[in-house]
A protein has these predicted regions:
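Membrane-embedded beta-strand positions of outer-membrane beta-barrel proteins
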Residues: 16-18, 67-69, 91, 104, ...
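Outer-membrane beta-barrel strand-turn architecture
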Residues: 8, 57-61, 95-99, 144-146, ...
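Outer-membrane beta-barrel translocator domains and adjoining extracellular loop/strand segments
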Residues: 27-35, 77-83, 114-121, 162-167
Length: 186
């Protein structure tokens, strides 16, 4: 039993990864809810970044579980720009095809901080944004060797990040992000 546990533990890999992304925060907000903001913003994207740690647990020869702890920043787009500082915990299942690893999973996020960029438009503040987010994750990873890899991930937020406003129940803010990065296993 001890030998089996030691063998299974030796196959678990730890690592770091970081990268940049395109934030496609989806937003629809009425003008009278937040002074100066458009009902729908048309700007296509904003930039974001991420970095964190991961653990990779083999479930079989080809199937792996991927658990991560990541800091990300997401910016809302359009007038009244706001940056959401997030701690994401994604969990994905990866399948190894000769170093190419498609993955699918989900994530939960805690949003401890919101940075408002004051200009002539009002930005969202901490009280306007929910503290938690969740959603689906799709990705693809290419491994150059056993240690170094590149990755791309798409986060599809399912939670409405705006706090409730009884006047505008149809207002919403959702996470939509594409990240591209580099990772290293120890």
């Amino acid at each position: 039993m001890i030998a089996f546990t030691a063998t299974a533990t030796a196959q678990v890999k730890f690592g770091i990864h970081a990268g940049t992304g395109i934030g496609l925060m989806s937003k629809d907000v009425h003008d009278d809810r937040y002074e100066g903001q458009n009902k729908t913003d048309k700007e296509p994207f904003s930039t974001s970044s991420y970095g964190g740690f991961f653990v990779e647990i083999p479930a079989s020869e080809k199937l792996l579980l991927d658990l991560r702890a990541i800091y990300t920043n997401h910016s809302t787009i359009g007038k009244g720009k706001t940056m959401l500082h997030r701690i994401d915990v994604p969990l994905a299942i990866k399948y190894d095809i000769s170093g190419l690893r498609p993955k699918v999973g989900g994530y939960v996020s805690y949003i401890p901080e919101v940075t408002s960029f004051e200009d002539k438009y009002r930005s969202f503040t901490r009280k306007d944004i929910e503290k938690f987010d969740y959603g689906a994750l799709l990705g693809l990873e290419y491994n150059f060797n056993e240690k170094l890899f590149i990755e791309t991930n798409f986060y599809l937020g399912l939670a409405n990040l705006l706090t409730k406003d009884p006047r505008h129940s149809s207002d919403y803010l959702h996470t939509r992000s594409i990240f591209v990065g580099l990772g290293y296993r120890f």
